[in-house]
Amino acid sequence: MAILLKNGLVYQEGEFIKEDVLISGSKIQAIGLDLPEEGAEVYDLKGKLLAPGLVDIHEHYREPGFTYKETIKTGSEAASRGGFTTVCTMPNVDPIPDDLETFEKQVALNEANSCVHLKQYGAITEDLTSDKVVDMAALKEAGAFAFSNDGHGIQQAGTMYEAMQEAAKVGLAICEHIQDDSLYHHGVMNAGKKAEELGLPGILGVSESAQLARDLVLAQATGVHYHACHVSTKESVELIRIAKEYGINVTAEATPHHLLLSEEEIDGNNGYYKMNPPLRSKEDQFALIEGMLDGTIDLIATDHAPHSREEKAGDMRKAAFGIIGNETAFACLYTKFVKSGQMDLSLLLDLMSYQPAKLFGLDAGVLAPGKEADLAVFDLDHAEKLSEEDYLSKGVNTPFTGQEVYGMTALTFVSGKLVYKSKHFAD
């Protein structure tokens, strides 16, 4: 059956236009006014924003191995509630997809359980911590989206150089968790005034920027597409800015939590504020925002990382690193930056859809006839209080719970199929 989305504010090619969208099967059939309703299931959007489905290139689903934290089903359902229709998942599961057989099993598991388009990262090295680079050609053939050891920085320059050479040969990106362990010192939050106040071990900002500087030189030497994951420091933003001026093939992401929060917002010794990289200083936060606005930061990615309540309870020294975010990212960012006038809505949408799709060669992020009907409808006028009871993720580990936000998702369609409908939507 055809689906007609009426009276939407459609975001198309950088413009917002009041028009309708007709879906036939898995594709967008037409965009315009007065499209035929006969034989179609009709949704009256009543002026809500109709946008390309969002694209998140950095999420952690814990299946197989850690399904008490999250499953592919719950993670993808949470993503759909956040308006995401394409998601790329990291390889820190058990077993790790670092060889062809394991990777193919992971892809089959993803396809059987996800309600959104799910792209799978391959590991850069075996076990995510060794110095043996995986068979990248074989993993690309099996469908690898890119390569990452996320959660672990690659410590040896020679290993990274070899990995970059191999990734460049197969034409896929190296997406790096930037962390020099010799400068990391097993900290639990940013090394700064807040850590001193709480008596907690700190993580130096230079543990990120020093390794980033090394990697940018190696990327220049190899020509690989090097992607800097969850950038968090002022120095990292400046290094990326300079690297782009030199023509190095580097892209970078920032997370919603690093854009929205700094260490100053940390509410005591609270495990829900423990993430890696940590929340940095206000100066770092402002540098990230500036980088987002001037194009140094290419895209926003959630780093959705669910854990059990027990793993996040209490003391930061014992709590796991990570924060959930795929259900709340767009609404929190819209409320903070767009409603306040700091940022255009078109830029936010591009950073969360068009940009990641374009930079990583994904067929997503654009609304046009003939394209896959991956769509998200956002209610920009309805205020909603974020509540644990509403989360579709198994994880509730976020400090944003209790905040009132605008722009939560009303409807999400993946390949023309309705995969999420808000309890607040009345058509």
Swiss-Prot record:
Residues forming the catalytic site: 303
The reaction(s) this protein catalyses: (S)-dihydroorotate + H2O = N-carbamoyl-L-aspartate + H(+)
CDD domains, alphabetized: DHOase_IIa
Pathway the protein takes part in: Pyrimidine metabolism; UMP biosynthesis via de novo pathway; (S)-dihydroorotate from bicarbonate: step 3/3
Keyword Metal-binding: yes
An annotated GO BP: purine nucleobase catabolic process
Keyword tags: Hydrolase, Metal-binding, Pyrimidine biosynthesis, Zinc
Residues binding Zn(2+) 1, per UniProt: 58, 60, 150, 303
Annotated cofactor note: Binds 2 Zn(2+) ions per subunit.
EC numbers for this chain: 3.5.2.3
Protein residues bound to Zn(2+) 2: 150, 177, 230
Pfam families: Amidohydro_1
Cofactor requirement: Zn(2+)
A single GO cellular-component term on record: cytoplasm
Annotated residues for binding of substrate: 60-62, 92, 276, 307, 321-322
Transmembrane segments: none
Any GO MF annotation of the entry: zinc ion binding
The UniProt record lists the keyword Transport: no
Physiological role: Catalyzes the reversible cyclization of carbamoyl aspartate to dihydroorotate.
Family according to the record: Belongs to the metallo-dependent hydrolases superfamily. DHOase family. Class I DHOase subfamily.
NCBIfam families xrefs: PRK09357.1-2 (NF006837), pyrC_multi (TIGR00857)
UniProt protein name: Dihydroorotase
Organism, as annotated: Lactobacillus leichmannii
Gene from which the chain derives: pyrC
